[in-house]
């Protein structure tokens, strides 16, 4: 029997999903993206060679894996073609392996202009977006005025749709944000030119997924960003514009939720966040700087330094619940090597002194809580590259056991380094 496994981040993104997706693609016939856009950044290291992917699923490096981009993904044609060229220059035959849903909304130049103008207008209250037009493209989708990949198959109809929406968006750019409009003819010509390369990769992704299911083949669904950035369930408004939680798998691909067999939550052994928003365990001391330096905490997409903090079991329990997580993959354990003490947030103290064990829904209230910590002894020995749990330092094993108890979920996979073979697998998602 084939299995359908979802991989998603359980924190604020940057949890190390790319490596784990690449590791698990040994078992699959297909990998599918179901939300987000080129604001995602997946860094893969294979035999010491670094590859950063933004739109294309991480399985693209495997010759026997179909890579699908579902309807929930917003597609920037220029970014996708640039990524394809980068991979083709490395000898990867992308166009034979990549399939795009015609229902993908397109990100076009006016979306990026709106994104940048909006962040500029917000000033110190900015969300901290990547400035790549993701949010405005999702807005157009929900407002039912967006253009989709399938529209490019009929150039005359596309030209009419584009003209109508650009009249609206250019009015907003000029008269509200007081910035230069985007040229319609240039946008039309460039997009139709790119369509010549994109349309041959267009396919009914939903139907393909169900064909894999009927043939009892394994499929992996690759999430982007993290659960605490979900548009509905994250730290709103400091969130992304898509559903990053398990529910987005079904709506972003057309693959019903009852067909999903296992949800793997990718979780760092500490916590990081890029951009603005609540982060109760954030560290501003030498330990925070240590984690940032040792963990190389800079965004794969933006290059921005990530905020670093201790492991937050309260936020993670919430993520486990809203995703029906089957098991956790703990990443970057080796970054904690050398610390005398490691802390885990086990509760929050509110502004009025009450202790709570769930994150506040209100973002302002979330930003005011203070973490309640449990301290555990650290370890001096290296965990880097360890492949068996019994070979980990005793204190590292105790840390993992403590986390399991706090989050009320099994830790099935432990990553001890960036390469795919630097992994401890306690329970394999495709055989669980």
Swiss-Prot record:
GO cellular component terms, A-Z? cytoplasm
Q: Where does GTP bind?
A: 13-19, 41-43, 306, 332-334, 415-417
EC number(s) reported in the record: 6.3.4.4
Cellular compartments annotated: Cytoplasm
Xref: SMART domains: Adenylsucc_synt
Cofactor or coenzyme needed: Mg(2+)
- Report any one BP term from Gene Ontology: IMP metabolic process
Similarity remark: Belongs to the adenylosuccinate synthetase family.
Q: How does it assemble?
A: Homodimer.
List, alphabetically, the PANTHER family matched.
Answer: ADENYLOSUCCINATE SYNTHETASE
Protein name (record): Adenylosuccinate synthetase
Q: Origin organism of this chain?
A: Hahella chejuensis (strain KCTC 2396)
By which gene is this protein encoded? purA
